[in-house]
Amino acid sequence: STTGAAVSNAAVILSADKSTSGISALTDGRTDYTVYRNGVLSSVSALRKNDVVTYDAVSNTVYACDTRVTVYYESCEPSPSAPVSIKVLGGTQFDVLPTAQQSLSNFKPGKTMTLLLTSDGTVAGAVENDYSARGNAIGIVSGSKVQLLCGSTTIDLSLTGMTVDSKLDGKLVSISSSSKTSVGLYAKTGGVSGDLNVREGTLGSKKLASGVMLFDDGVLKNLSDLTDVSVPQSRISYARTNA
């Protein structure tokens, strides 16, 4: 898939905006690769500090993802010093890349940390919760279920023993956790403003990407699925750009 997850067992976390440092190690020196960022066709100029980059050699495609989620570290396998998988967010299991084990070894279960995720939802690194790499994870609530949006992938959260507020049904929410017994879900509002022109594929003055993710009452839809010619800003609860 040209918009999906990268096939890779290694990742690079960018140290600066528009940086290609470290990418050549993934691509074996090739520079003629295609770039996708958060599931959308992009370019090196759109890359940002702390983006996680992986590489699919078959399609010669670089995948960048900026999803960062602040979590309470619940458990891991087989050990905190070299975890291959961890559980966070109410028992949700995330696989850990070999290249991420060193940064994860700085944390032990019972602590909070911010995970940097690849475009397919694998852990590429872990950092302290600070301004330089603050969590930005968002998801969609559908009934009692919550899906974390990661690149062009959605990840079902386990939320074991937790109850989702029915008032959040169908809403886009921010996601974070600082304790074993709860996950913070807060409705997102605002963001990019403007009316959605379905026919022209624009939001205000901005052109929508072909792989734009749209949610209508919590259901993922394509732009072509919308029957309205336009959707006024008053009916759009939240929108953001890939930048």
Over which residues does each language-model region extend?
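...the same signal can extend to comparable exposed beta-sheet modules
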Residues: 1-243
